[in-house]
Regions:
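Short amphipathic alpha-helix with an adjacent loop that forms part of the alpha/beta core around
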Residues: 218-232
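C-terminal capping/lid region of NAD(P)-dependent oxidoreductase domains
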Residues: 3, 317-326, 334-354
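NAD(P)H dinucleotide-binding glycine-rich loop of Rossmann-like/cofactor-binding domains
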Residues: 51, 69, 84, 94-160
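Glycine-rich beta-strand-centered segment in the early N-terminal region that forms part
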Residues: 27-44, 56-102, 122
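N-terminal Rossmann-like NAD(P) cofactor-binding module of classical short-chain dehydrogenase/reductase
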Residues: 96, 236-239, 261
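Short, well-ordered loop/turn sites that connect or cap secondary structure elements
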Residues: 86-89, 149, 254
Length: 354
């Protein structure tokens, strides 16, 4: 095998989308025992990649500085001392999985614990953008949000047309089937910033209701609209990607004993001035943040197992739809980043390696 591979890099270490380029002299990773070297076919594009490109979300320095949190591909080499005879994996297997980084490259090392066999029903393009998206949604709903049919009768996803929320809305609609199959499905709501995205959320994803945030520039009154379409009731679980300016209105929309899972700050991390935090007490509210990339291998492996057992079958049989908005050749990865930055997508953007 050649000594070098091609990988996406950033001129001067950080910069805008236009600074991305293909570095043809990137060393191929050395594969260790317990790992597989994967020849990458496709990778998903995520907000974390954009933050890393901007120098605001560093990679795991002792592993790789290459962007890319999810991939699909083919096993090229087994780790040292690993053989197909004593291993479930073999060279040529089609796989996909979650990464700490490194997916924007021709080859990537992956811990075997995080590998998932690609079903024949899924293309490399579909599989390449699955894990970061669906694992994040699963984590928010089940691991942190602690969904139960008894205590979670309503769920709200902010940024409802984002890839994670698209997955999360679908998971929420069917969450009772995992927890308590005889219980009614929860009511699922979302917010978005364009009317066509709200229509997509309701018509294509089947949400109970969606609110156009562009009609609520005060960043507060949307909460009243959500409660109105929820028959006057508050929301039990809110998953938020918008950030600081929405803390108070998230408290407004919560039901008693409601939870907020904070996964991002698209509108910035700073709260509005004079935020009223009384809702923390009066509603017994809980707010918890999370960042999937910083989680341990053991934690991520639990998500992997949950996905393989309870989500992947639904992606194969059609219960869940993995919405791929755009497939872009990787030498135009800058265009893929710009699509996300300009909020032009309803679903996932995936790059394919030629």
């Amino acid at each position: 095998m050649a000594e070098f591979m091609r990988a996406v890099d950033v001129k001067d270490g950080a910069g805008p989308a236009s600074a991305l380029f293909i570095n043809e002299f990137t060393p191929i990773p050395v594969v260790s025992s317990g790992e597989c070297l994967i020849k990458v076919k496709a990778f998903g594009v995520n907000r974390g990649d954009i933050l890393q490109r901007d120098g605001k979300y560093p990679g795991i320095s002792h592993l790789t500085k290459i962007m890319g949190l999810e991939f699909s591909g083919v096993i090229s080499r087994l780790g040292e001392d690993d053989t197909a005879e004593k291993d479930e994996w073999k060279v040529g297997d089609e796989v996909f999985g979650l990464l700490y980084g490194g997916g924007y490259a021709e080859y990537v090392n992956v811990n075997k614990r995080m590998l998932i066999k690609k079903p024949k029903e899924l293309s490399f393009e579909q599989a390449g953008g699955l894990c970061e998206t669906w694992f994040t949604a699963m984590q928010a709903l089940h691991f942190i949000g602690q969904y139960s049919a008894e205590t979670t009768r309503s769920i709200l996803w902010h940024a409802g047309a984002s890839a994670v929320a698209v997955a999360g809305i679908q998971l929420s609609k069917h969450a009772h089937l995992i927890d308590s199959p005889d219980s009614p499905a929860p009511r699922v709501f979302a917010t978005a910033r364009k009317q066509d995205k709200c229509a997509f959320i309701m018509d294509k994803l089947g949400a109970t209701g969606a609110v156009d945030m562009s009609q609520h520039p005060d960043k507060r009154s949307w909460a009243n609209e959500i409660k109105a379409i929820n028959d006057g009731h508050g929301i039990d679980l809110v998953i938020d990607f918008l950030g600081g300016p929405y803390l108070e209105s998230n408290l407004d929309v919560l039901a008693l004993d409601g939870r907020v899972v904070q996964l991002g700050w698209l509108d910035g991390p700073i709260t509005s001035a004079n935020v009223n935090i009384a809702g923390f007490l009066t509603k017994r509210a809980r707010v918890q943040g999370s960042q999937l990339r910083s989680r341990s291998l053991e934690y991520q492996a639990q998500l992997r197992d949950f996905f393989e057992a309870d989500v992947l079958p639904g992606l194969v049989n059609g219960r869940f739809q993995h919405v791929v908005e755009r497939v872009v050749p990787w030498d135009r990865v800058n265009e893929a980043h710009e699509l996300l930055e300009n909020n032009q997508t309803k679903g996932k953007v995936v790059c394919v390696i030629s």
